A protein has these predicted regions:
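Alpha-helical interface subdomain recognition
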Residues: 1-104, 113, 126-131, 138-143, ...
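Short Ser/Thr-interspersed hydrophobic loop/turn segments at strand-loop and sheet-helix junctions
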Residues: 73, 96-102, 197-199, 214-222, ...
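Short glycine/proline-enriched turns and hinge-like loops at secondary-structure junctions
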Residues: 88-90, 158-161, 186-191, 205-209, ...
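N-terminal glycine-rich flavin-associated loop
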Residues: 110-130, 159
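A short, Trp-centered hydrophobic/proline-enriched beta-strand micro-motif
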Residues: 142-151
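Flexible, small-/acidic-enriched active-site or ligand-binding loops
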Residues: 162, 220-249
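A short core secondary-structure module
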Residues: 172-173, 177-225
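Long, acidic (Asp/Glu-rich), low-complexity accessory segments flanking structured domains
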Residues: 247-264
Length: 441
């Protein structure tokens, strides 16, 4: 892999004309249907008797939004296969996902929530007809939720070769033992199935030791030890759960794609998933700057609007510039996936995953600052938005892994193209270099 590979076609970042009506319809649906009911959805969940359940009326409200979305054809459009979705290109979906990121329940309302989107794409691409009928169909219908179990408590899971949760074939069943934690969505009572990354061949080549297996949540061998907190919150009823597999038996046919092909599936799932996260993050940044500007223009201190005090106007300007630079990077990464394929575009995917969450964190932090104490209170969504983005710097690979992928690719590009041997003296101490350096001082 040599650097951030480009083609002339990748610089055309326009949305497809045939997708424009869908984009406009999604934007209108979120504004007219989802936004007016968002506060009510969360209000209904306050003071509920069952913490790992939903308040009276919550799911009914969400189901009504889903029904309206289905009626308008705004359903499963994230899938690249036109038989089950709209057949959108990654670039086209990037524009839509940005709108989804502006509202915390928009993705659920249109059946485009993580981790379901990644799991549905895996099942759609590599699932058997039986697996699709049993699990993909209810997911596509929005009838159930799902989880993806990869991270483990006792190993650095950023290197997936370390996966130690074992699955041993016993006759016609896989027997799974081990632990997983921070399994997002596993606390939701609607979560019925998870895709579990396990070690099936410990003596095989490093990238052929793992497999991915479908495990029903109600399997008696699955024990939920409790929620893993994120910034002091358990994120109920969604949750990020700590799971233990105790002689968990599942049918042999529950394996996806075949034994030892877990890494292949991860590339199918995690590449698009990382892009989707970054797309939604741009939407969160847009919401943060909107709140920042409105607060700055409507609040006064020392006889002036807050926006004009100190460096606040510079803060707003930098936020807008950063959003537009991130947007272009994410759109280019999406176009790279369309033009080059997921594997060839993985350096682009790592580039945006390393860049976007940390910059969006910074923008939300500035919005919090302009709001004062209200910025960290229950009266604005900014605190939750910040913790979500800060967590994203760890989810689907920490920043450092993605910086490494990009840096390594850049080094390889120079090695492959020029066989360069770097001599700093040749760069900085030649007569020409001295002239340039002096001119720059």
């Amino acid at each position: 892999m040599a650097g951030l590979e480009t083609t002339p076609e990748m610089f055309d970042l326009r949305m497809s004309e045939e997708v424009r009506p869908l984009f406009d319809a999604v934007k209108k649906f979120i504004t007219e249907e989802v936004d007016p009911h968002t506060n009510e959805f969360f209000r209904l969940g306050e003071g509920r008797e069952e913490r790992w359940g939903y308040g009276e009326g919550q799911l009914e409200l969400l189901d009504s939004l889903k029904a309206k979305a289905k009626e308008q054809g705004l359903w499963n459009f994230f899938l690249p296969d036109a038989e089950t979705g709209e057949g959108l290109k990654n670039l086209d979906y990037a524009y839509i996902a940005t709108e989804l990121g502006k509202n915390p329940i928009a993705s659920q309302s249109l059946n485009c929530s993580a981790p379901d989107t990644g799991n549905m794409e895996v099942l759609e691409r590599v699932g058997t007809p039986e697996q699709k009928e049993k699990w993909l169909t209810p997911l596509l219908n929005g009838e159930i939720r799902s989880a993806y179990a990869m991270t483990e408590p006792d190993i650095p899971s950023s290197d997936a070769k370390n996966i130690s949760c074992r699955a041993i074939l016993d006759g016609d069943e896989w027997v799974i033992n081990g632990e997983k934690f921070y399994i997002s969505g596993a606390g939701d009572p609607r979560c019925k199935i998870m895709i579990c990354m396990v070690q099936t061949n410990p003596d095989g080549p490093p990238h052929k030791r793992q497999s991915q297996i479908l495990v029903p949540m109600d399997n008696p061998g699955v024990e939920i030890l409790g929620p893993c907190h994120v910034f002091g919150k358990d994120d109920a009823p969604h949750g990020h759960m700590h799971l233990r597999f105790n002689d968990c038996r599942v049918p042999k046919d529950n394996i996806l794609l075949g034994e030892g092909r877990g890494f292949e599936i991860s590339q199918v799932r995690l590449g698009p998933g990382r892009i989707h996260h970054c797309m939604r993050s741009i939407g969160a940044a847009e919401r943060a700057i909107e709140m920042m500007v409105k607060r700055g223009l409507t609040r006064e201190a020392f006889g002036k609007p807050i926006a004009s005090l100190g460096k606040n106007i510079e803060v707003i300007a930098k936020a807008r510039i950063e959003i537009e630079s991130m947007r272009r990077m994410v759109l280019t990464a999406a176009k790279a996936m369309d033009e080059l394929g997921n594997e060839a575009a993985r350096v682009w995917v790592s580039a945006v995953k390393a860049m976007v969450p940390i910059r969006v964190c910074h923008i939300i932090d500035e919005a919090i600052q302009i709001h004062g104490a209200a910025g960290v209170s229950q009266w604005t969504p900014l605190a939750d938005m910040y913790t979500s983005q800060r967590t994203l710097r760890l989810a689907d690979g920490p920043d450092e892994v993605h910086w490494f992928v990009v840096g390594r690719a850049e080094l390889r590009r120079w090695e492959e193209e020029g066989g360069i041997k770097y001599d700093p003296k040749a760069d900085y101490y030649s007569e020409d270099s001295k002239t340039v350096l002096t001119a720059g001082i």
